[in-house]
């Protein structure tokens, strides 16, 4: 009961407050620790003057910064690590320890609070990502496998939809226009075949390479008729007729038109054009239905964006509440509350010693404040033991 004896109290307080009781190294260490506490109110003391922990959240990722002070601190630089391991240019290859120049070049006169603040600013400017081999952080909505929960890119499942063309009329289009428009819309630009009279209206031969296989997969393949190696009809012609055929294109084309293979190709072409026109008409009938479904998809996509934004805000709020209710934060609050109750009890004792309060009032109020102080300290110590025991086998609380 030193508070009952003013001389003993004043002597003990002067001895404790005298800087002569601490070495210059210890005084500098205490100043750096106070700088750290003043700069970051949410920091938690894991072990007095040895280990501190600062949780923070960036991009829905909660990270703990662990600050370990070696025995010869501040002559030795502090060891700053993070959990879970992250990928960042200020971290080592394993993503555990901070390799910032401010930490590497730490001296006795460095400001530890400003160093941690600069580290947080850099994390906010360039957000880190979880290391691929790291375990998930023990929160309810932690993203598995270290994958970011919300990618910043958009939703690529909606292809651009071309505006409908007005006054489209399939019957008014010629075959050449239909083929040219289809080629322009769905394939790359190809060299135009040379025009030689009636040959320009004939279909191009279907290639037999990989492009032919891809066309067949879509159900639009066409097999060319077999071309014979010899034409018996030409053996009946004279040399002069063959010469005229070689020199005159019209005669050569007439001979070609008599070939059964070419007649089959022309017939197949006409059938194919009719099928294309019929399919185009059916597609036009589906235009209004597709427009309605497209608008429905766009409306649902807009609703999805709104729900995504609301979910992200709630997730951020959940992480903030989770941090405020974490074991480290509760321990820090209990410590502050116990210190406040102790100061209030000391003030009550000083008022009693100065004769400002009666003994009955003093006993009631002092006993109440002291009981609160000891209860809070006991809870704080018990919580510290639970955190220390849990950190040995599990992730930090």
UniProtKB/Swiss-Prot annotation:
Chain positions with Phosphoserine modification: 18
VPS37 C-terminal domain ranges (all copies): 308-397
Alphabetical keyword list: Endosome, Membrane, Nucleus, Phosphoprotein, Protein transport, Transport
Intracellular or extracellular location(s): Late endosome membrane; Nucleus
Annotated S-S bridges: none
Protein topology in the membrane: Peripheral membrane protein
Chief location category: membrane
Family matches, as InterPro entries: ESCRT_assembly_dom (IPR037202), Helix_hairpin_bin_sf (IPR029012), Mod_r (IPR009851), UBQ-conjugating_enzyme/RWD (IPR016135)
Any one biological process term the GO annotation gives: ubiquitin-dependent protein catabolic process via the multivesicular body sorting pathway
Regions annotated as coiled coil: none
Gene3D superfamilies in alphabetical order: Helix hairpin bin, Ubiquitin Conjugating Enzyme
A Pfam family recorded for this sequence: Mod_r
A GO cellular-component term linked to this record: nucleoplasm
Function: Component of the ESCRT-I complex, a regulator of vesicular trafficking process. Required for the sorting of endocytic ubiquitinated cargos into multivesicular bodies. May be involved in cell growth and differentiation.
Subunit structure: Component of the ESCRT-I complex (endosomal sorting complex required for transport I) which consists of TSG101, VPS28, a VPS37 protein (VPS37A to -D) and MVB12A or MVB12B in a 1:1:1:1 stoichiometry. Interacts with TSG101, VPS28 and HGS. Component of an ESCRT-I complex (endosomal sorting complex required for transport I) which consists of TSG101, VPS28, VPS37A and UBAP1 in a 1:1:1:1 stoichiometry.
Protein's name according to its UniProt entry: Vacuolar protein sorting-associated protein 37A
Species of origin: Mus musculus
């Amino acid at each position: 009961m030193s508070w009952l004896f003013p001389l003993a109290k004043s002597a003990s307080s002067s001895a404790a407050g005298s800087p002569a009781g601490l070495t210059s190294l210890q005084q500098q260490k205490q100043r750096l620790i106070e700088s750290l506490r003043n700069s970051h109110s949410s920091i938690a003391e894991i072990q007095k003057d040895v280990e501190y922990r600062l949780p923070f959240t960036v991009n829905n990722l909660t990270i703990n910064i662990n600050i370990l002070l070696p025995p010869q601190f501040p002559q030795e630089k502090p060891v700053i690590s993070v959990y879970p391991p992250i990928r960042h240019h200020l971290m080592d290859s394993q993503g555990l320890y901070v390799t910032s120049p401010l930490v590497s070049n730490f001296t006795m006169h460095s400001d530890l609070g400003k160093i941690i603040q600069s580290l947080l600013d850099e994390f906010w400017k360039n957000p880190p990502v979880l290391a691929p081999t790291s375990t998930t952080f023990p929160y309810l909505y932690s993203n598995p496998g270290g994958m970011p929960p919300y990618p910043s890119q958009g939703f690529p499942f909606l292809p651009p939809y071309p505006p409908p063309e007005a006054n489209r009329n399939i019957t008014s289009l010629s075959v050449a226009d239909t083929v040219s428009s289809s080629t322009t819309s769905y394939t790359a630009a190809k060299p135009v075949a040379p025009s030689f009279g009636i040959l320009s209206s004939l279909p191009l031969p279907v290639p037999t390479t990989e492009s032919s296989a891809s066309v067949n997969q879509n159900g639009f393949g066409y097999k060319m008729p077999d071309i014979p190696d010899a034409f018996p009809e030409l053996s009946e012609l004279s040399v002069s007729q063959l010469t005229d055929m070689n020199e005159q294109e019209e005669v050569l084309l007439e001979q070609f038109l008599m070939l059964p293979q070419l007649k089959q190709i022309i017939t197949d072409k006409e059938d194919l054009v009719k099928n294309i026109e019929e399919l185009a008409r059916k597609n036009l009938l589906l235009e209004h239905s597709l427009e309605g479904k497209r608008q429905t998809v766009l409306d649902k996509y807009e609703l999805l964006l709104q729900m995504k934004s609301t979910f992200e805000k709630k997730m951020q709020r959940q992480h903030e509440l989770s941090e405020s209710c974490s074991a480290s934060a509760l321990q820090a609050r209990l410590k502050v509350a116990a210190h406040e109750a102790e100061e209030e009890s000391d003030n009550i004792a000083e008022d009693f010693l100065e004769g400002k309060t009666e003994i009955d009032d003093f006993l009631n109020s002092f006993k109440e404040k002291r009981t609160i102080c000891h209860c809070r300290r006991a809870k704080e110590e018990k919580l510290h033991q639970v955190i220390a025991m849990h950190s040995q086998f599990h992730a930090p609380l």
